[in-house]
């Protein structure tokens, strides 16, 4: 009988990682070869990371403003918690 597995989750670590990426693009360069949006437990975090990937693909620097603009362009900014939440990620660093 399979009662259901709880997927591994460390949402605080996800948030810390995203804050690090937004604050310093070198962090993205270090993890991008291994990390994919679907690796995030929280859908909001997956969307934020995907926005970072899209920015890199477009040769746009990753920072608080560009991530918020990309999320807004994707109609996802409010879903992830708004600009305030994105900003709060960088304050964890």
Q: What is the role of each PLM region?
A:
Residues 1-93:
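Noncatalytic partner-interaction/assembly domains of nucleic-acid and motor enzyme complexes
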């Amino acid at each position: 009988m399979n009662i259901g597995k709880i997927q591994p989750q460390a949402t605080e670590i996800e948030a810390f990682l995203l804050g690090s990426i937004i604050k310093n693009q070198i962090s993205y360069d270090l993890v991008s070869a291994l990390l994919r949006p679907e690796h995030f437990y929280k859908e909001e975090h997956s969307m934020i990371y995907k926005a970072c990937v899209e920015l890199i693909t477009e040769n746009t620097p990753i920072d608080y403003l560009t991530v918020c603009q990309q999320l807004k362009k994707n109609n996802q900014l409010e879903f992830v918690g708004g600009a305030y939440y994105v900003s709060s990620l960088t304050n964890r660093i």
